[in-house]
Each structure stands twice: as C-alpha cells, then as structure tokens.
Amino acid sequence: MFSPQSRLRHAVADTFAMVVYCSVVNMLIEIFLSGMSFEQSLSSRLVAIPVNILIAWPYGVYRDLIMRVARKASPAGWAKNLADVLAYVTFQSPVYIIILLTVGAGWHQIVAAVSSNIVVSMLMGAVYGYFLDYCRRLFKVSSYHQAKA
C-alpha cells in the first residue's frame, strides 16, 4: 500500500509502537506504583491514545536526531541505550504531566507517576527504543528493514 520509503509508513509504525508500549507500561505504573485507581488509569490511557497518535511521529523524529548525535559521540551499545533513555524521558515527561492533569490526578499522584515513570524509563526507555526499532522493521520502514533484515 505504501512504499518502504513512505513517510506515512514510518509514521504508522511509530504510532503503533507508541500507543501499544505507553498503554501497557504506563497503566502498570499508574496502578501499581502511583496508587491510581483502575478507573483513573483507564481514563488516563484513553486520553493518552489520541495524544500518543499526535506525538508518535514527532517523537520518532526527535529520537532519531538524538540517536544520530549519540552515534557520532560513540558507536558503543551503551550510547544507544543512553540516547534512548534521554529521548524518552525528555520528550514524554511533559506530555505525561499534561495527560495526568487532564484526568484529574492530584499533584501527589502526578509527582509519584512522573517520578516513577522517569525511574522506570531509565530501564524501559531503552526497551522502548528496541520495541520501536522492531515495529519499524515489522512495518518494513526502508532504513530499518534493509539495515536490520
């Protein structure tokens, strides 16, 4: 339907990855670490889906820029992982705060959720990067399909 070089194909892959990953990981954080009720977390995730759809491709472009800088600094695997964490935390935390404010979370819940998300992102930011790369290969985005196939 779309060529492997298609920007739309790239955007769809990035959107799929962000919606799936953020829905699962953030719901677990909100319920088990932040003390939000299931209903609050579900509301947060439902609000987050359209937000994630809007920010997924810009985040992918932002991440790719940070990855290029990291590759120039060091080709080592730790540099990629560090760049993934940095990209994820610096882009997602402000968005997450806005989502939580929108669904009526209290400041203590927001601080707990965002702080927990930052800590978890130190582990999971790199995991999201690998998941995003996997989704790009799955959707046959040209630079990922050819380079990693």
Curated annotation (Swiss-Prot):
Record's bilayer topology term: Multi-pass membrane protein
Cellular component, GO annotation: plasma membrane
Keyword Transit peptide: no
Main location: membrane
Pfam family, one: AlaE
Molecular functions per Gene Ontology: L-amino acid efflux transmembrane transporter activity
Segments crossing the lipid bilayer: 16-36, 46-66, 83-105, 115-135
GO biological process: amino acid export across plasma membrane
Keyword terms, alphabetized: Amino-acid transport, Cell inner membrane, Cell membrane, Membrane, Transmembrane, Transmembrane helix, Transport
Signal peptide: none
Subcellular locations according to the entry: Cell inner membrane
Similarity section: Belongs to the AlaE exporter family.
HAMAP family: L_Ala_exporter
General function of this protein: Exports L-alanine.
Protein known as: L-alanine exporter AlaE
